[in-house]
Amino acid sequence: MAFNDCFSLNYPGNPCPGDLIEVFRPGYQHWALYLGDGYVINIAPVDGIPASFTSAKSVFSSKALVKMQLLKDVVGNDTYRINNKYDETYPPLPVEEIIKRSEFVIGQEVAYNLLVNNCEHFVTLLRYGEGVSEQANRAISTVEFVTAAVGVFSFLGLFPKGQRAKYY
C-alpha cells in the first residue's frame, strides 16, 4: 500500500520495516524510515536539538547526524502516517537491502541541504536507491516563482509610469 488509507490522529497504522514515516510538524513534514521493533532511522541537526525544534535549525545546517530512535520519540506530540508515496514511480528495494543500508549509516554525519539533501531525500534514498523530495521541489518552485516575479517588477520599475503602457 503506497498510502495508509486508515490514517487518523489516533491510529496511523502499524508500519512494516522499510516503510516511510511522514511526521507532521508545524509548517513542514519530517521523514523517517521504519526499521522494526518501534525504531526508525532519520537525520537530525548535529547538535542534538530536540525533534520538535529541528525545523528552524535545519534551514541553516549543512550537516546532519543519522540516528536510530524510537518512533514515539521522533514523533513526540506530533502526528504521523505511513506514506510510501513514491512506490508507483520507484520500486522499493528489498526490505533486507533497505535495513542493511540503514544499519550501515547509523551514527554517521552526512551532508544536509534543505533543498537538495534533506530528511525526505535521505529516507527515499534508503528505500528506493534514489533521493526524492516533493517538499523540496515545491520549495524550489516557490523560490523560482518569487525570483521571476521580483525580476518582472524590478524591470517594470525601470520605466516611468506613462511609458509602461507603450511596451505591452
Swiss-Prot record:
InterPro entries: H-rev107_PLA/AT, LRAT_dom. One of its GO terms (biological process) is lens fiber cell differentiation. Keywords: Cytoplasm, Hydrolase, Lipid degradation, Lipid metabolism, Membrane, Nucleus, Transferase, Transmembrane, Transmembrane helix. Pfam families: LRAT. GO terms for molecular function: N-acyltransferase activity; O-acyltransferase activity; phospholipase A1 activity; phospholipase A2 activity. The active site is at H30, C119. Its EC number is 2.3.1.-, 3.1.1.32, 3.1.1.4. Residues 1-138 are cytoplasmic. The chain crosses the membrane at residues 139-159. The keyword Secreted does not apply. Residues 20-135 form the LRAT domain. Residues 160-168 are lumenal. One of its GO terms (cellular component) is mitochondrion. It catalyses: a 1,2-diacyl-sn-glycero-3-phosphocholine + H2O = a 1-acyl-sn-glycero-3-phosphocholine + a fatty acid + H(+); a 1,2-diacyl-sn-glycero-3-phosphocholine + H2O = a 2-acyl-sn-glycero-3-phosphocholine + a fatty acid + H(+); 1,2-dihexadecanoyl-sn-glycero-3-phosphocholine + H2O = 2-hexadecanoyl-sn-glycero-3-phosphocholine + hexadecanoate + H(+); 1,2-dihexadecanoyl-sn-glycero-3-phosphocholine + H2O = 1-hexadecanoyl-sn-glycero-3-phosphocholine + hexadecanoate + H(+). Belongs to the H-rev107 family. PANTHER family: HRAS-LIKE SUPPRESSOR - RELATED, PHOSPHOLIPASE A AND ACYLTRANSFERASE 1. Exhibits both phospholipase A1/2 and acyltransferase activities. Shows phospholipase A1 (PLA1) and A2 (PLA2) activity, catalyzing the calcium-independent release of fatty acids from the sn-1 or sn-2 position of glycerophospholipids. Shows O-acyltransferase activity, catalyzing the transfer of a fatty acyl group from glycerophospholipid to the hydroxyl group of lysophospholipid. This is Phospholipase A and acyltransferase 1. It comes from Homo sapiens (Human). The gene is PLAAT1.
